[in-house]
């Protein structure tokens, strides 16, 4: 017997219902007819039983119909639940992904928090170092150029003119140049203008320069070396006021005058070219500054020779310009050549050697060549240590070696020994202490990049001590000079009073 579908069952059941209903009606009609004609009781009982059976069949058919409807409802509910289960599976998978992403973000946040805490410590250290820088600037305006990396790396003509105007004997550089000599009145005026400018009194310095310039042009004409010198001085004052356009115009005018009057290959022309390159560098015009710097280099090589220290200074300037343009191959070549000149002519202990190594290491850092940069930084610090304490051995270690040992033993039970017990090694940086302090900070930053936070903090702490000691020493020196000056004035006044009394007593 084949299995019938639900629809067939329902259809057949309905047909049976109709047939049974018709049969019941017929039996009722017969029973009524029998009752009316008073048939015998057996037939009536039989019909009654048949009616009961038919009614039972009707009831069962109705139950079957209700059961079928219930089964249909159950099937629909089952389908609905399957859909919900499928959706819940999808939501569960999405929640798992979200949980994994959240955990990754949480871990990254924890790492970022740790990194920010280290950066906060580093910034606090830098702020403490800056405090000493600012104090030193307020005490000595001449030292402000150290805080300006462009001025630091560009020894411009302001410094050169000061040397030329100094009453000391002329240098080898000056001996190789003939002809023009800066008059005494301009030397005095230059010193006076620099003094006013260093005090920020530009309202006095600028009119003073302009008046002197007018007087020179009236007496000597525009195309005169003295006029060019005065234009240079005024340009430097404008540069300090950030009036770069006016300063550039003055320097170009001075360059033209010096080229006409002194010759295109005169050192003064090289100095003006260098000043103009510095000015363009401050304005970010590195591409325009580079040919000027190269021309100044050619002049100095021709006049002084290729291995003169002033040539090395110009090479440093040129390297910085190329570095700001991303020409790292040329940067490395110029810095290396400058370093060779300094080491051969001035010796390995000259401050310019450490400064150039620091600059070259900075070039390596920008290229991601951290190992080479680290080597140079360590060379600078090792040399500074050897100058003060002698050769390196197991008991006489430079600061970077001590820092790395503290990093290695930071998880030991014993506490790290304070670096102060190793001695004030930073006293080794007597002339070039700013360079050594900068090297400490740079190597500390490199250690932080490598996750060596204990070593970084050791170097930063030492740099801060060096700054503080230099500041305290400067304060003591100034106080001593002030007391000495007051004592000299007091002694002079007493001597004058005694001389006056002797003259008075000597009169009849």
From Swiss-Prot:
Keyword Ribonucleoprotein: no
The keyword Amino-acid biosynthesis appears for this protein: no
Coiled coil ranges: 34-129
Protein name as catalogued: Kinesin light chain
Organism: Drosophila melanogaster (Fruit fly)
InterPro entries assigned: Kinesin_light, Kinesin_light_repeat, TPR-like_helical_dom_sf, TPR_rpt
Subcellular location, principal: cytoplasm
PROSITE patterns: KINESIN_LIGHT (PS01160), TPR (PS50005), TPR_REGION (PS50293)
Residue spans of biased composition, Basic and acidic residues class: 493-508
Gene: Klc
Comment on protein domains: The light chain is composed of three structural domains: a large globular N-terminal domain which may be involved in binding to kinesin heavy chains, a central alpha-helical coiled-coil domain that mediates the light chain dimerization; and a small globular C-terminal which may play a role in regulating mechanochemical activity or attachment of kinesin to membrane-bound organelles.
Role played: Kinesin is a microtubule-associated force-producing protein that may play a role in organelle transport. The light chain may function in coupling of cargo to the heavy chain or in the modulation of its ATPase activity.
GO BP, one annotated term: microtubule-based movement
Pfam (any one): TPR_10
Family note: Belongs to the kinesin light chain family.
Phosphothreonine: residues bearing it: 168, 477
Ranges of the TPR repeats in the UniProt entry: 186-219, 228-261, 270-303, 312-345, 354-387, 437-470
Region called Disordered, residue ranges: 156-175, 484-508
């Amino acid at each position: 017997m084949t299995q019938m579908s639900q629809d067939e069952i329902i259809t057949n059941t309905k047909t049976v219902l109709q047939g049974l209903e018709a049969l019941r009606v017929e039996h009722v009609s017969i029973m009524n007819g029998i009752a009316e004609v008073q048939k015998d009781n057996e037939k009536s009982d039989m019909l009654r039983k048949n009616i009961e059976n038919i009614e039972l069949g009707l009831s069962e058919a109705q139950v079957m119909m209700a059961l079928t409807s219930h089964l249909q409802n159950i099937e629909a509910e089952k389908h609905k639940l399957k859909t919900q289960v499928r959706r819940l599976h999808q939501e569960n998978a999405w929640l798992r992904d979200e949980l994994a992403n959240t955990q990754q973000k949480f871990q990254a946040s924890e790492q970022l928090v740790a990194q920010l805490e280290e950066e906060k410590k580093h910034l606090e250290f830098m702020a403490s170092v800056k405090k000493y820088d600012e104090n030193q600037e307020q005490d000595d305006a001449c030292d402000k150029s150290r805080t300006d990396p462009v001025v630091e790396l560009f020894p411009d003509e302001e410094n050169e003119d000061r040397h030329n105007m100094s009453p000391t004997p002329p240098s080898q550089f000056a001996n190789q140049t003939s002809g023009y000599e800066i008059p005494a009145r301009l030397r005095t005026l230059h010193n006076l203008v620099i003094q006013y400018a260093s005090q920020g009194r530009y309202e006095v310095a600028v009119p003073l320069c302009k008046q002197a310039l007018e007087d020179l042009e009236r007496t000597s004409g525009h195309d005169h070396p003295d006029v060019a010198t005065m234009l240079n001085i005024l340009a430097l004052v404008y540069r300090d006021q950030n009036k770069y356009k006016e300063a550039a115009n003055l320097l170009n005018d001075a360059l033209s005058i010096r080229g006409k009057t002194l010759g295109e290959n005169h050192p003064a022309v090289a100095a003006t070219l260098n000043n103009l390159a510095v000015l363009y560098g401050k304005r970010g015009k590195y591409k325009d500054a580079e040919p000027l710097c190269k021309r100044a280099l050619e002049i100095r090589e021709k006049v002084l020779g290729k291995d003169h220290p002033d040539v090395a200074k110009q090479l440093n300037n040129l390297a910085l310009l190329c570095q700001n343009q991303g020409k790292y191959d040329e940067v490395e070549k110029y810095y290396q050549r400058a370093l060779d000149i300094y080491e051969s002519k001035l010796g390995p202990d000259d401050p310019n050697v450490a400064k150039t190594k620091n600059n070259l290491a900075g070039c390596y850092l920008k290229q991601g060549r951290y190992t080479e940069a680290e080597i140079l930084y360590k060379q600078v610090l090792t040399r500074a240590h050897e100058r003060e304490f002698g050769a390196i051995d197991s008991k006489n270690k430079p600061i970077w070696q001590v820092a790395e040992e503290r990093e290695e033993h930071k998880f030991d039970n014993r506490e790290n020994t304070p670096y102060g017990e190793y001695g004030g090694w930073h006293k080794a940086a007597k002339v070039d202490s700013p360079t050594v302090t900068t090297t400490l900070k740079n190597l500390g930053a490199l250690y932080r990049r490598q996750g060596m936070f204990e070593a970084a903090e050791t170097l930063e702490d030492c740099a801060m001590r060096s700054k503080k000691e230099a500041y305290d020493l400067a304060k003591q020196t100034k106080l001593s000079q002030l007391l000495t000056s007051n004592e000299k004035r007091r002694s002079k006044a007493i001597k004058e009073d005694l001389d006056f009394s002797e003259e008075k007593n000597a009169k009849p």
